[in-house]
């Protein structure tokens, strides 16, 4: 007797097969692009569809080699702050002078780093952890040896190293790359507490298999070693524009009230003089935007939250935002979702011309736009089947030459956007016949850290009703240990080589696929059907929130002349 498949299950099964096929195409495309060194196309895939977990250890180093924030770095500082009253930088209270920063006893610093790293290895037998700890500690120390005058050690540096080692191999052997993969203890009542796991390492291809014919096409040589990759990804995560200079220039420009306006709209007094929604700001500005959007989009959920001490890791109640905002998801997010967040950061690329690069990197003095191509050169069939919009597109924004004399600052762009998208404005001319833009790469239109802000809002919106029902302890647990958001993606990549698709039916109910953070409570958080969605759903939602919120902001802050 043939068993009838319920319509809902059949629909889900079909969706899964389609998703699995798309994941296979993505893997094959990435391998081919890797073999050709096409970092432009790989960056586009990273910021839109994401890099397959099997391939991050090869793709991320290539993306970091050509990342604008690595070629021309500028990071936020935790050693000095700007004194606006006296117009100079001063040491953060309790910080050693710049000449003494590197004189702190190395042994004390090493112990501090090891103390934080061991929180990850708490369930691993001690005999197996020493080598991994030393490798990770050395990566952090090498970063500090170069950058400690600007950024002294914080626990976030250790957790970024751990997060990186979950995708970038510490060692390699005949089985391929070996990565961190701690087996967290499940918190059901049947597990034995504090029982150590034999190892925290596992072959990447065991968890995320790759067919042999694709393995053979991967580049054999490594671009960077682990320490070099770590330094570069920290430069991206801690990147910060020169906000002090930018604010001064924008304020000076806004004082030219007598200058004629290009469009039909002017900035309301005191509004948007320095609001780098596009070009990005420092950590304080990112946090300010987060809470502003949070309170606007999710007013009910926002009520119990506070901005006080929001980016300090010491507070259990508010420390989650330190991991979200300052560390780009380290520690608080599951590795699969953090991988996607870091894909977005590493795949960020502005239009490859000097003006646009300098619009985002306003401190830049290097010329490197020649390193990039503006059109797809390989696998056009695959790219033509994907959306040709940046997830954070906005009407007409991609047609404005950012950074040129007319659009030097964010508020210049805002004026133009509102003017172009207002009622009565002339429609743009039709495309010129024969002008084929099918192979044109859609580049990033806003700062990557601002993108993450809206992704975080989308995550909260996605879980809004659940969070509204939670008690304070449950909410804190959720925010400090965000349940997996991309489970459908993860299942497809783990079963890339499976022939028997019937395993799918077990995939969405297996609790083994729900990793838990060590020491988490017995709360059953994130085990509903929504966890089976793709991360791309969150990314799409974030783009929608961005467009709606920006338009409301423009209408509120500008007045018709």
Curated annotation (Swiss-Prot):
Gene3D superfamilies: Ypt/Rab-GAP domain of gyp1p, domain 3. One of its GO terms (cellular component) is cytoplasm. It is found in: Cytoplasm. InterPro entries: Rab-GAP-TBC_dom (IPR000195), Rab-GAP_TBC_sf (IPR035969). Keywords: Cytoplasm. Disulfide bonds: none annotated. Residues 50-349 form the Rab-GAP TBC domain. Residues 507-526 are annotated as: Disordered. Belongs to the OCA5 family. This is Oxidant-induced cell-cycle arrest protein 5. It comes from Zygosaccharomyces rouxii (strain ATCC 2623 / CBS 732 / NBRC 1130 / NCYC 568 / NRRL Y-229).
């Amino acid at each position: 007797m043939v068993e009838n498949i319920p319509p809902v299950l059949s629909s889900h099964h079909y969706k899964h097969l389609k998703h699995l096929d798309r994941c296979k195409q993505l893997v094959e495309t990435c391998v081919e692009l890797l073999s050709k060194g096409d970092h432009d196309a790989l960056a586009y895939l990273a910021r839109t569809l994401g890099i397959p977990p099997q391939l991050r250890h090869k793709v991320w180093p290539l993306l970091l080699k050509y990342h604008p924030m690595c070629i021309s770095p500028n990071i936020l500082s935790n050693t000095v702050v700007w004194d606006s009253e006296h117009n100079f930088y001063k040491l953060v209270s309790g910080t050693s002078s710049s000449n003494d920063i590197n004189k702190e006893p190395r042994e004390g610093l090493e112990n501090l780093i090891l103390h934080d790293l061991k929180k990850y290895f708490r369930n691993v037998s001690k005999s197996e952890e020493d080598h991994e700890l030393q490798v990770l500690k050395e990566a952090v120390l090498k970063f500090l040896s170069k950058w400690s005058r600007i950024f002294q050690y914080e626990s976030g540096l250790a957790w970024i190293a751990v997060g990186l080692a979950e995708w970038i191999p510490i060692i390699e052997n005949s089985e391929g790359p070996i990565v961190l993969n701690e087996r967290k203890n499940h918190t059901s009542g049947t597990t034995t507490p504090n029982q150590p796991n034999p190892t925290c390492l596992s072959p990447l291809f065991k968890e995320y298999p790759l067919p042999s014919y694709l393995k053979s096409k991967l580049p054999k040589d490594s671009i960077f070693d682990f320490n070099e990759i770590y330094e570069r990804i920290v430069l991206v995560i801690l990147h910060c524009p020169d906000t002090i200079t930018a604010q001064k220039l924008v304020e000076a420009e806004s004082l030219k009230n007598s200058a004629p306006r290009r469009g039909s709209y002017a900035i309301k007094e005191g509004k948007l003089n320095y609001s780098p929604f596009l070009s990005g700001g420092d950590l304080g500005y990112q946090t300010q935007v987060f809470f502003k959007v949070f309170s606007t989009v999710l007013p009910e959920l926002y009520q119990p939250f506070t901005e006080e001490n929001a980016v300090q890791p010491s507070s259990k109640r508010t420390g989650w935002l330190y991991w979200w905002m300052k560390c780009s998801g380290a520690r608080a997010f599951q590795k699969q979702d953090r991988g996607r967040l870091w894909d977005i950061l590493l795949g960020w690329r502005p239009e490859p011309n000097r003006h646009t690069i300098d619009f985002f990197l306003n401190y830049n003095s290097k010329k490197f736009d020649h390193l990039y191509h503006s059109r797809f050169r390989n696998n056009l069939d695959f790219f033509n089947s994907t959306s040709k919009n940046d997830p954070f597109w906005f009407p007409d924004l991609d047609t404005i030459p950012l950074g040129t004399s007319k659009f030097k600052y964010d508020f210049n762009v805002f004026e133009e956007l509102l003017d172009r998208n207002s009622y009565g404005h002339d429609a743009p001319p039709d495309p010129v016949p024969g002008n084929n833009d099918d192979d044109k790469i859609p580049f990033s239109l806003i700062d990557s850290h601002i993108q993450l802000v809206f992704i975080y809002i989308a995550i909260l919106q996605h879980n809004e009703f659940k969070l509204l029902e939670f008690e304070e302890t449950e909410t804190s647990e959720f925010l400090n240990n965000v349940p997996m958001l991309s489970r459908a993606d993860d299942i497809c990549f783990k079963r890339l080589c499976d022939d028997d698709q019937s395993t799918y039916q077990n995939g969405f109910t297996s609790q083994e696929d729900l990793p838990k953070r060590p020491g988490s409570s017995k709360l059953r958080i994130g085990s509903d059907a929504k966890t089976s969605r793709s991360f791309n759903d969150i990314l799409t939602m974030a783009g929608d929130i961005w467009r709606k919120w920006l338009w409301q902001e423009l209408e509120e802050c500008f007045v018709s002349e």
